[in-house]
């Protein structure tokens, strides 16, 4: 029987970055290849009804070993890693019995995981921690989740004395580019409720996400020779700058926390003739979320009024909503996860997700899906790390949740 660390180290060797630019499903071929490998592994450990569809979704079943009817639960993780940093040739290192000091990730490039910048690592002093070599991300988001789920399923198969109902396993592509639930067949999956293992540090239990939208701002300028441009030229670069400055300067990711929302400018492409701004809009409160969408549209209207012509076009598109609306209808799914953590000596930390998970969309598709910790920290970057014990406890948590549903 493989342990969770062995699985994790094997999975991160496979580059499964998703792509913002691709229109294929999944967005990268390597995700489909990885999905097929996972499907074979699920069959090998003894799961039933294993399927890998053409879109890269993996599903499988662990059959009930009890007579009474209990809810069918699902455990879900995503296969892709973030496009934000390379996932090619990940070269992990295990820092044994971490001593509480700065960790040199790459001596040659002077890349150091410093405790004054990432103080949360001190919580794991004395533990074994998996880190990067400073050149890539680690992939704990979310291959730690995959390793934990499969390890838990194998444990349940090898320990039939632990009673459980029917359990569904699902692995999705393209979560990191917001498409993880696009082709997820909730009916085929067949669960009454589910949990994603896509959270951060040990103990995190999340049932709230942002409401999310994206906005594309197109600015049409007019280029005229600068020598004769007076009262003729409209410089789209300067209009773009005006637009940016008309949104609240403190309502940005780097100046907000907790339940505070924001406007996040992702990219700017501009020249005199035309400019394009790409934003994401986030807020936990549905009313404030709607107000933010109107606010960014209003900026465009004001600029058009100032120039007395339609030079700014703002297109806003919703992405996902705060899953709390749906989780609150079946609050016991959170209560059971809370009790399961307590039962294995983990202190639950109820926190809002300042982001989204597949569970955000799935909850609105009829599958209530709160999020559990996978154990990692500093996702999407070279300072990503995951304590080995956190992964082991996440696998143990999956087992305990299954057990509590059987005894419910």
Curated annotation (Swiss-Prot):
<feature type="binding site">
    <location>
        <position position="141"/>
    </location>
    <ligand>
        <name>Zn(2+) 1</name>
    </ligand>
</feature>
<comment type="function">
    <text>Cleaves the N-terminal amino acid of tripeptides.</text>
</comment>
<feature type="binding site">
    <location>
        <position position="78"/>
    </location>
    <ligand>
        <name>Zn(2+) 1</name>
    </ligand>
</feature>
<keyword id="KW-0378">Hydrolase</keyword>
<feature type="binding site">
    <location>
        <position position="141"/>
    </location>
    <ligand>
        <name>Zn(2+) 2</name>
    </ligand>
</feature>
<feature type="active site">
    <location>
        <position position="80"/>
    </location>
</feature>
<dbReference type="InterPro" id="IPR010161">
    <property type="entry name" value="Peptidase_M20B"/>
</dbReference>
<keyword id="KW-0645">Protease</keyword>
<feature type="active site" description="Proton acceptor">
    <location>
        <position position="175"/>
    </location>
</feature>
<dbReference type="GO" id="GO:0005829">
    <property type="term" value="C:cytosol"/>
</dbReference>
<feature type="binding site">
    <location>
        <position position="198"/>
    </location>
    <ligand>
        <name>Zn(2+) 1</name>
    </ligand>
</feature>
<dbReference type="GO" id="GO:0043171">
    <property type="term" value="P:peptide catabolic process"/>
</dbReference>
<dbReference type="InterPro" id="IPR036264">
    <property type="entry name" value="Bact_exopeptidase_dim_dom"/>
</dbReference>
<dbReference type="GO" id="GO:0006508">
    <property type="term" value="P:proteolysis"/>
</dbReference>
<dbReference type="InterPro" id="IPR011650">
    <property type="entry name" value="Peptidase_M20_dimer"/>
</dbReference>
<dbReference type="Pfam" id="PF01546">
    <property type="entry name" value="Peptidase_M20"/>
</dbReference>
<keyword id="KW-0963">Cytoplasm</keyword>
<keyword id="KW-0479">Metal-binding</keyword>
<comment type="similarity">
    <text>Belongs to the peptidase M20B family.</text>
</comment>
<keyword id="KW-0482">Metalloprotease</keyword>
<feature type="binding site">
    <location>
        <position position="176"/>
    </location>
    <ligand>
        <name>Zn(2+) 2</name>
    </ligand>
</feature>
<dbReference type="InterPro" id="IPR001261">
    <property type="entry name" value="ArgE/DapE_CS"/>
</dbReference>
<feature type="binding site">
    <location>
        <position position="380"/>
    </location>
    <ligand>
        <name>Zn(2+) 2</name>
    </ligand>
</feature>
<dbReference type="GO" id="GO:0008237">
    <property type="term" value="F:metallopeptidase activity"/>
</dbReference>
<protein>
    <recommendedName>
        <fullName>Peptidase T</fullName>
        <ecNumber>3.4.11.4</ecNumber>
    </recommendedName>
</protein>
<dbReference type="GO" id="GO:0008270">
    <property type="term" value="F:zinc ion binding"/>
</dbReference>
<dbReference type="InterPro" id="IPR002933">
    <property type="entry name" value="Peptidase_M20"/>
</dbReference>
<keyword id="KW-0862">Zinc</keyword>
<keyword id="KW-0031">Aminopeptidase</keyword>
<dbReference type="Pfam" id="PF07687">
    <property type="entry name" value="M20_dimer"/>
</dbReference>
<dbReference type="GO" id="GO:0045148">
    <property type="term" value="F:tripeptide aminopeptidase activity"/>
</dbReference>
